[in-house]
């Protein structure tokens, strides 16, 4: 019996790409995890303003404040992710914590011109989260060997062989520098005796046999967030037109682990099981600009905001481990200690939001935000000419425009405020069911120099999870039932 283990820890740069359209969606998606009042009104503040988290929605929101204030929030997510793969259902529970903090200074009656008020502020909050923990398990007639076979298509056998004077480590490094990610996957499978090569047909074939289906288990754990720091300037002209500018700094950090296990091959199969692990560490930074307007028309307010693309630079580190157990061989372990290192850029699509709000007798407020984003405008790039042409072409073909909706309302009853809202975010990938529907609610108390707010949301997030990007492309249906709680305290001065 033979165990082939390939494990990589030595850091080196890879001449190739492993990013795909799912990465483009993740880097472009905006969840806007703000303070309690912002959440409880469905993140709908595009024409209302006057909220620290609302600055991230519309830069003109800052000059709606009458007094300066600072505030902070604690956000707690309770998730239950249910997966359905080939009729087998699993569920995993998890809890995650986030935060929000901001401050804004308001200057009124400054000079004798038509600039009645202006403000400077800074706000920090999570723009998106990458925390997930779920299990996909079931019987399948397709094997992960197809992933390796697809990556081996067109690969020359002499390039993934280990010759005299070479090592697993040196060949793997050479493949990364010269051919990239796909050839490395073929190398893993060939050296682990999952794939063999037919000299007559000049093609690779799998040594695994599975006529009666396979048992598969895929565990996914990810921790990370896209944090956004916003520097805001806003003013009001002639007591009618609020306008503002945001300069945004983005920071992305993600740690993810994907463990795929497959067994129950035929009794005469040369392969007994496959255990394939991928650990990915992503670190990125970016910059974006926002412009916003809010125009007052009697009891109504009309808002408009434009978000520029976000220009990101990324550094990824990929650790891989492939273990294949085969019959009729003595144990053997190969451990070259390699880390794949990728440097690349991503430009997210721009976004436009139109808002309408009304305030009735300073008691009842209503707001509607309609946001448009063209996901196909996302673009990967690197110093390698043409490296991302096929990936970007795939984005243009498969990602569509989306329209998202946010509705919020607030009723003031003295020091008590009652709030509610709806969030609807749609999926740019037309071939999948993948959207977020959230119902939000909350309440708050306004004291002489402070406020205390509580916000809650219930969400059903539907998504199809595809096991691999090629070959084994079977999908599991995921439903994330999430309950989010936020508590916020603000000081007014």
Please state what every model-predicted region is:
Residues 19-33, 38-39, 106-493:
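Outer-membrane beta-barrel porins/channels
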Residues 36, 48-57, 63-139, 227:
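Outer-membrane beta-barrel translocator/receptor signature
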Residues 1-22, 493:
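Bacterial Sec-dependent N-terminal signal peptides
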């Amino acid at each position: 019996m033979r165990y082939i283990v390939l494990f990589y820890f030595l850091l080196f740069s890879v001449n190739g790409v492993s990013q795909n359209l799912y990465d483009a969606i993740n880097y472009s998606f905006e969840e806007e995890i703000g303070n309690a009042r912002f959440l409880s009104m469905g993140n709908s503040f595009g024409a209302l303003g006057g909220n620290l988290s609302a600055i991230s929605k519309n830069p003109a929101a800052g000059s709606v404040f009458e007094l300066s204030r600072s505030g902070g929030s604690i956000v707690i997510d309770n998730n239950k992710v249910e997966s359905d793969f080939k009729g087998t259902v699993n569920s995993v529970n998890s809890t995650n914590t986030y935060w929000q903090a901001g401050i804004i200074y308001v200057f009124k009656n400054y000079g004798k011109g038509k600039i009645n008020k202006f403000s400077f502020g800074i706000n920090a909050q999570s723009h998106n989260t990458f925390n997930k923990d779920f299990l996909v398990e079931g019987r399948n007639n397709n094997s992960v060997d197809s992933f390796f076979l697809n990556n081996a298509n067109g690969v020359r056998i002499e390039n993934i062989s280990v010759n005299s004077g070479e090592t697993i480590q040196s060949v793997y490094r050479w493949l990364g520098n010269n051919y990239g990610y796909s050839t490395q996957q073929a190398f893993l499978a060939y050296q682990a005796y999952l794939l063999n090569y037919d000299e007559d047909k000049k093609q690779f074939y799998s040594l695994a046999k599975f006529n009666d289906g396979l048992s598969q288990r895929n565990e996914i754990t990810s921790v990370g967030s896209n944090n956004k720091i916003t520097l805001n300037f806003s003013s009001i002209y002639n007591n009618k037109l609020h306008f503002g500018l945001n300069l945004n700094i983005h920071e992305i950090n993600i740690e993810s682990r994907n463990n795929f296990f497959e067994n129950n091959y035929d009794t005469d199969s040369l392969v007994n099981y496959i255990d394939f692990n991928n650990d990915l560490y992503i670190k990125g930074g970016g910059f974006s600009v926002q412009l916003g307007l809010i125009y007052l028309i009697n009891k109504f307010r009309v808002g408009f905001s434009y978000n520029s693309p976000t220009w990101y630079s990324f550094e990824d580190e990929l650790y891989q481990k492939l273990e294949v157990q085969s019959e009729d061989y003595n144990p053997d372990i190969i451990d070259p200690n390699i880390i794949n290192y990728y440097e690349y850029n991503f430009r997210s699509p721009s976004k436009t939001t139109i808002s309408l709000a009304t305030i009735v007798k300073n008691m009842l407020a209503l707001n509607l935000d309609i946001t448009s984003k063209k996901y196909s405008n996302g673009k990967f790039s690197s110093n390698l000419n043409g490296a991302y042409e096929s990936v970007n072409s795939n984005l243009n073909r498969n990602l569509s425009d989306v329209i998202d909706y946010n509705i919020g309302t607030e009723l003031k009853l003295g020091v008590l405020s009652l709030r509610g809202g709806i969030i609807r975010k749609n999926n740019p990938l037309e071939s999948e069911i993948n959207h977020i529907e959230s119902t939000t609610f909350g309440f708050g108390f306004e004291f002489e120099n402070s406020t205390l707010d509580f916000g809650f949301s219930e969400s059903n997030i539907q998504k199809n999870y595809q096991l691999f990007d090629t070959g084994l492309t079977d999908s599991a249906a995921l439903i994330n039932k999430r309950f989010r709680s936020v508590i916020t305290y603000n000081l007014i001065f």
